[in-house]
């Protein structure tokens, strides 16, 4: 997928395996395996993902189980259920979201702290 394109995995679709790509991806269905994207991944409220995820940015409205490594940002919205460890420089968890795991934010602190 070329940069700038968005792929959609619809509500009735189940994918088992590895997903890789350079564009954005929206998951409304179910994915099991591993996901590696160069851009933005969105898991919609109907989406269920059981996978380790690597992406630039991740927005979760549905369910995700597995470790997450984002180079930019992870947003866990109020309707989301997430189980797994997160590594990202910025993480947002909205009130109402369910999260079970650990968060590692690789942020450089000033020397005087």
From Swiss-Prot:
GO biological process terms, semicolon-separated: chromosome segregation
Stretches that traverse the bilayer: none
Keyword entries, A-Z: Chromosome partition, Cytoplasm, Cytoskeleton
UniProt xrefs under InterPro entries: BacA/B
Its biological purpose: A non-essential component of the chromosome segregation machinery. Positions the ParA-ParB-parS chromosome segregation machinery within the cell; BacP seems to be the most important bactofilin in this process. Forms a heteropolymeric, subpolar scaffold in the cell; BacP probably forms the core, BacO contributes to position and integrity while BacN does not seem to contribute to assembly.
Complexes and interactors: Interacts with BacO and BacP, the 3 proteins colocalize as an extended structure.
Protein name, entry field: Bactofilin BacN
Species annotation: Myxococcus xanthus (strain DK1622)
Phylogenetic classification of the source organism: Bacteria, Pseudomonadati, Myxococcota, Myxococcia, Myxococcales
